[in-house]
């Protein structure tokens, strides 16, 4: 660290002057990499380990971080603190070595909490919509000249990164409930987009436990803080009397403090009116499709309005919103070989949604924006436990598309569960008589199988949270042609 950076750090976090070197185990994850980037730009020495390089590790290396693609005890011995992701087991050799050397080992949310401690923290929580809402808020604050620090779980396209160190007191961060680690955060403002049964292994399978954890998170707000909550969500509405903090509600509901009205979608843009208490109506053009994104925008507007940001800045940010990586991510429009003498093209969209509610929202946005296109989905279920727990919901939602291709379940380290795999899910959907799903044996087969069924004006949704995003990028790179298989065999 240079003298100027050290002086800045002593002003923001005086006690952290003892920390020089921060090591991240599992640094290639978006959440871990984002925090590492902010700390690197604050002047800390950053190192980390992961199993393989990716865009996150490449970006951090360019910032001066030392990245190891193995887990070894010697990687941590010079560290002041070791930050560990949820995916890392306690017997990881770097964790064992750090504990033996009496180096503090903390979770990523604890480090995020330290970044937030001396700033005006805005935490975005909820089962769905966190990443996009965080990006919208960051865009609005940047448009208003407030230069926020942000830490997001997905790529913020306008910034070209998951995280950025700003010069102001504002820190906008995605708050992760998957391991309950968001309880470490003590923000000034907290958004709750919705609450559904997901990551239930963390909550002992008890939905009441999950709901109480969200209440505990909101109780981390100071008495002068504010909770911004989606009143359209039945669970959020149920919890309102238990929050005990100042609340602003938002949604399509008539009793919302920030109400969405007259929503319509034209292609990739949503158009709607926002009614706010004691404020003029604003007519919003949002450069993101779907009613779910209108809700995300309403949450961001509620926070920005409370902060006193001008409507003109809010509206400019939303109409110019560039989106986030793998959230209805438009990868291109590609010409197809003529069918029956008619020219056609296929629109390729990559989406991270892996819960039935998220998949449903993506399908609805595609139908609303491109009603004349045939919806072709390549889907990869994520985790056997989620597939088992939400099996009927998945079968119902996936039956809405016109053509369905399905990869096997992305296990994320879980053992297979009989009856909760892709073959069973395809069979269930087929037996309902609406659709005849195509089981894709492996990722290498996907481009060729897609090419065989595309005709005319198709909209291809590549959907899921596993490694399916790599397939989407390969499809775009080769303009939907089935060259992936040969390239991978010979590359």
From Swiss-Prot:
Subcellular location: Cytoplasm
Coiled-coil portions: none
Main location: cytoplasm
Keywords annotated in UniProt: ATP-binding, Cell cycle, Cell division, Cell shape, Cell wall biogenesis/degradation, Cytoplasm, Ligase, Nucleotide-binding, Peptidoglycan synthesis
Record flagged with keyword Acetylation: no
Pathway: Cell wall biogenesis; peptidoglycan biosynthesis
CDD domains according to UniProt: SIMIBI (cd01983)
Xref: Pfam families: Mur_ligase (PF01225), Mur_ligase_C (PF02875), Mur_ligase_M (PF08245)
Catalytic activity: UDP-N-acetyl-alpha-D-muramate + L-alanine + ATP = UDP-N-acetyl-alpha-D-muramoyl-L-alanine + ADP + phosphate + H(+)
Top-rank taxon: Bacteria
Enzyme Commission code(s) on record: 6.3.2.8
Binding positions (ATP): 126-132
MF-aspect GO terms: ATP binding; UDP-N-acetylmuramate-L-alanine ligase activity
Gene Ontology biological-process entries: cell division; cell wall organization; peptidoglycan biosynthetic process; regulation of cell shape
One of the record's GO cellular component terms: cytoplasm
Broad EC category: ligase
HAMAP family (alphabetical): MurC (MF_00046)
Role this protein plays: Cell wall formation.
PANTHER family in the record: UDP-N-ACETYLMURAMATE--L-ALANINE LIGASE (PTHR43445:SF3), UDP-N-ACETYLMURAMATE--L-ALANINE LIGASE-RELATED (PTHR43445)
Family of the protein in this entry: Belongs to the MurCDEF family.
UniProt name for this protein: UDP-N-acetylmuramate--L-alanine ligase
Species whose genome carries this gene: Yersinia pestis
Gene name of this polypeptide: murC
